[in-house]
Amino acid sequence: MERAPPDGLMNASGTLAGEAAAAGGARGFSAAWTAVLAALMALLIVATVLGNALVMLAFVADSSLRTQNNFFLLNLAISDFLVGAFCIPLYVPYVLTGRWTFGRGLCKLWLVVDYLLCASSVFNIVLISYDRFLSVTRAVSYRAQQGDTRRAVRKMALVWVLAFLLYGPAILSWEYLSGGSSIPEGHCYAEFFYNWYFLITASTLEFFTPFLSVTFFNLSIYLNIQRRTRLRLDGGREAGPEPPPDAQPSPPPAPPSCWGCWPKGHGEAMPLHRYGVGEAGPGVEAGEAALGGGSGGGAAASPTSSSGSSSRGTERPRSLKRGSKPSASSASLEKRMKMVSQSITQRFRLSRDKKVAKSLAIIVSIFGLCWAPYTLLMIIRAACHGRCIPDYWYETSFWLLWANSAVNPVLYPLCHYSFRRAFTKLLCPQKLKVQPHGSLEQCWK
C-alpha cells in the first residue's frame, strides 16, 4: 500500500525536492543493496501470489470447502493475490529508482486499486471474525444458514463496495475539488497524503474500528468457550455415571488435534454424533467398556462374556437381540451410552471451537502487528507534515503491511484442517490416495 513518495528512502538527504525527481531520482543505494532489495521484493511477490493462488485453487479442487465461512477466506485470498500480482510489482521500480515512470493515469489506477485491496483485506478479516463469532455464540441459526451461498456473496460484495468508498472517491476527485494537483512530476501518491483530518477519519474506519471489532469478537468467543467448558465439567461432576468397580479402565476417545484431525492411531475414529445411539460406531466401544458393558450391567461378568469382550470388543446385551424385549439393565445401558455419546460430541465441539478461537487469535495478532505501525506513523507523519518521522521507518511500515498479504495464506493450512487437506490434494495427490489418513503430516514435513 504505497502512501508516500519514496525519495526519503532513495535520497541521503531525505528531502522531497522536485529537482531530484526531475533529474531521475538519485538513488542512495549501492548496486549490491539494490540487488538485495530487488531480490527480497521479488521473493515477497512470489510468496504472495503463489500462496493466495493455492488458496483459490483449493476451492476449485475441493468442493467441500465451498461453505459460507470459507467463501470469506476466499474473498481475503483474492484481495491478497491482487496485492502481490498488481500493487507490489508496480511499486518496485518506483522505490528502486525514486521516480514514477508509468504516467499519471496508471498512477491513479494503481492508487485506487492499492487502497481498495488493503482496505478490503481489513474488512474481510472483520467479516471472518464476525462469522466465527456467530458460529460459536449462535450455533443453531448459523448452521441453518450454511447452505445460503447468496447471503455470503452479498456480504463479500459489500466488503468491496465499502473498501472502495473509503478511499476511491477521494483519490479520483481530490485534485478537482482542491483546484489542482499538488503531486510533483515523476511521483505517485494520494493528494490527501498530508491532510491530517482526512487520514485520522480514514484510519479510524480502516484500522481502529476493525481492530476493536475483531478483538471483541475473539474475546467473546474465548469467554463463551470458557463458560461452556466450565458447565461441562460441572455437569460431569454432578451427573456423570460411575463405572462399576470391576470394569476394565479404558481411555476416552482422543479429541481432535490442533489440526482438526485425529492423532495417529485413530485414523478410523470419528465423533459419535455421526452415529445413532443404537449404532456401534468408533468410540462407542470405549464408552461402553468404561461404563461396564455386558449383560450384567454393573455386576461381575461371567467368564464366557468376559472372554467374548476381550476378543470381539464389548458386546450388546443378549436381551437386545432381534425379537426380544429390552430388560431394565439394557435400557440403563442404552441411557448411559447416550450420555457418553452426548458428552463426547460436546467435547468434540468444544475442541473445535477452541481451535477456531486459536486460529482467529493468530490471524488477528498478525493483523495488528502488520497494520498498527503503518497506521500510527501515517497519522503522526501527517500531523507534522513529514518532518518528525524518518522516511525509512515509514517505508518499512507499509512493506510490513504488504507482508500481511503473504502471511495470510500460510495461516490457513496451519489452523484449518479442511484447507490443509485441500492443499495436500493439490500438492501430494498420490500420498493422499495411498494413505488417506496419515499423509497430511508426511506431505507437510
Swiss-Prot record:
Pfam families: 7tm_1 (PF00001). Residues 234-259, 286-336 are annotated as: Disordered. This is Histamine H3 receptor. Residues 1-39, 92-108, 178-196, 381-396 are extracellular. Expressed abundantly in brain, most notably throughout the thalamus, the ventromedial hypothalamus and the caudate nucleus. Isoform 1 is largely predominant in all tissues. It comes from Rattus norvegicus. Glycans are attached at N11. Proxyfan acts as a potent neutral antagonist while thioperamide, ciproxifan and FUB465 act as potent inverse agonists. Belongs to the G-protein coupled receptor 1 family. The gene is Hrh3. It is found in: Cell membrane. InterPro entries: 7tmA_HRH3, GPCR_Rhodpsn, GPCR_Rhodpsn_7TM, Histamine_H3_rcpt. Residues 300-312 have a biased composition (Low complexity). One of its GO terms (biological process) is G protein-coupled receptor signaling pathway, coupled to cyclic nucleotide second messenger. Residues 61-70, 130-156, 218-359, 418-445 are cytoplasmic. GO terms for molecular function: amine binding; heterocyclic compound binding; histamine receptor activity; neurotransmitter receptor activity. The H3 subclass of histamine receptors could mediate the histamine signals in CNS and peripheral nervous system. Signals through the inhibition of adenylate cyclase and displays high constitutive activity (spontaneous activity in the absence of agonist). One of its GO terms (cellular component) is dendrite. Residues 241-256 have a biased composition (Pro residues). The modification Phosphoserine is found at S439. Disulfide bonds join C107-C188. It comes from the Eukaryota. Keywords: Cell membrane, Disulfide bond, G-protein coupled receptor, Glycoprotein, Membrane, Phosphoprotein, Receptor, Transducer, Transmembrane, Transmembrane helix.
